[in-house]
Design a protein with these regions (language model features):
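Short S/T/G/P-rich N-terminal loop/turn motif that feeds into the first structured element of a domain
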Residues: 1-81
């Protein structure tokens, strides 16, 4: 297995008004983040994408962390995700 080093990291916080909205978003992830999309992103330098739910009382938040091979890889993937 060829392990790539992360040289560029992008973190995104997403806040929702209610727990139901957050749950609906989480359920829709398979429709948004398809295998084809991940293949395309990986070919352009995405190393890893992690989605985490934040369990703070009174907050409805997720975080998404994107790890890239380089800043250039980030820019390529950003154009794919627009």
């Amino acid at each position: 297995m060829n392990k790539k080093n992360t040289t560029f990291l992008n973190s995104l916080y997403m806040d929702f008004l209610t727990e139901n909205e957050l749950d609906l978003f989480l359920k829709s992830l398979d429709e948004i983040w398809t295998a084809e999309l991940y293949t395309n992103l990986k070919q352009n330098g995405l190393i890893r994408h992690v989605i985490s739910k934040v369990w703070n009382k009174g907050q409805h938040r997720i975080t998404q962390d994107f790890e890239y091979e380089s800043q250039d890889s980030f820019k390529k993937c950003e154009s794919i995700l627009k």
